Amino acid sequence: MPSLKDLKNRIGSVKNTRKITKAMQMVAAAKLRRAQEAAEAARPFAERMTAVMTGLAGSVGSSESAPRLLAGTGSDKVHLLVVMTAERGLCGGFNSSIVRLARAHAAKLLTQGKTVKILTVGKKGREQLRRDLGQHFIGHVDLSEVKRMGYPVAQGIARDLLDRFDKGEFDVATIFFARFQSVINQVPTAQQVIPAVFEGEGEVSSLYDYEPSEEGVLADLLPRGVATQIFTALLENGASEQGARMSAMDNATRNAGDMINRLTIEYNRSRQAAITKELIEIISGAEAL
């Protein structure tokens, strides 16, 4: 049974931990608001751009003049997985859920005889994937110095992907991130960015005249579309990370409070038992006299 001193020290230690988790929860809440606003502000632009490109892609179709970013290489042998996670932990299952989805996708592709290459964005995904998929790594993007996520970061990642695609290093590129829905709900998502995939009809491009041509406009828009999708994913990831951290730190703070209550009860019982024992010894000594 722990001594009163040990129990007192444990109570003090848990109280200090609760202060830290509470502070981290408040910081995450402040960051979440900014990250959520940024993610929500980017969605209309991304949706509008996708609608325009969808219409153009529908008109261009699979013609010989279709841009390579739309038509693809004609093969799906080599897949590049871009796994986006956080630089830090203490955010519940945020990082592990994205890694789990990427790992399952990689396993499926390898089973089909495909070649898998992995580009990690963020420290935590790299750490977790290195254990069993490290031999497939081809690069890493360090976000530790990024204070606020901006479009230039996405442009840099997009340029790297486009350069690798032009060099024939892969056929299909898929990004993995968490789509923000609420503080307690972040959805791990896999989204193909190269070659471009469009669903629905989008804008009716026959209502417009394009110069120099629909193919030319689409060829110019597609690289921007890749950067926009990556930027949107980074913003969604940022909001999801802060939401997950806020929720995790709230749970940790609650658990610390429960532990303090249990330890306090144990401390009071032990103290009461010690006092009772001391009184019995005093009474027994007095009776002996």
Swiss-Prot record:
It is found in: Cell inner membrane. Produces ATP from ADP in the presence of a proton gradient across the membrane. The gamma chain is believed to be important in regulating ATPase activity and the flow of protons through the CF(0) complex. It comes from Cereibacter sphaeroides (strain ATCC 17023 / DSM 158 / JCM 6121 / CCUG 31486 / LMG 2827 / NBRC 12203 / NCIMB 8253 / ATH 2.4.1.). F-type ATPases have 2 components, CF(1) - the catalytic core - and CF(0) - the membrane proton channel. CF(1) has five subunits: alpha(3), beta(3), gamma(1), delta(1), epsilon(1). CF(0) has three main subunits: a, b and c. The keyword Nucleotide-binding does not apply. HAMAP family: ATP_synth_gamma_bact (MF_00815). One of its GO terms (molecular function) is ATP binding. SUPFAM superfamilies: ATP synthase (F1-ATPase), gamma subunit. GO terms for cellular component: plasma membrane; proton-transporting ATP synthase complex. Its main location: membrane. This is ATP synthase gamma chain. Belongs to the ATPase gamma chain family. NCBIfam families: ATPsyn_F1gamma (TIGR01146), PRK05621.1-4 (NF004146). Signal peptide: none annotated.
